[in-house]
Amino acid sequence: MKVTDVRLRKIQTDGRMKALVSITLDEAFVIHDLRVIEGNSGLFVAMPSKRTPDGEFRDIAHPINSDMRQEIQDAVMKVYDETDEVIPDKNASSEDSDEA
């Protein structure tokens, strides 16, 4: 199985999330809502997850071996490094808003 497409949007935020990502596997299966996160040891790709009733986060989809995890990490980070455009976070306050 190969990563055949990566769609990435860098996000401008004060938080640790740096980008939202969708990947396509074998030109046949798409996984949305991966995230590039700034961790203590640098950037890494987090799999899509949801919060459980007890407050824990649980992956919705994830690779089951280290080779596939590394392929996803490499493909996403290559596109991340090549992407210059940063989209402002919708939740960030805008100081230059014209609304009164």
From Swiss-Prot:
GO biological process: division septum assembly; sporulation resulting in formation of a cellular spore
Superkingdom of source: Bacteria
SUPFAM superfamilies per the UniProt record, alphabetical: SpoVG-like
Keyword Transmembrane helix: no
Keyword field: Cell cycle, Cell division, Septation
Similarity section: Belongs to the SpoVG family.
Alphabetized HAMAP family for the sequence: SpoVG
Known function: Could be involved in septation.
Protein's name in the database: Putative septation protein SpoVG
Taxonomic source organism: Staphylococcus haemolyticus (strain JCSC1435)
Biological classification of the source: Bacteria, Bacillati, Bacillota, Bacilli, Bacillales
Gene this protein is translated from: spoVG
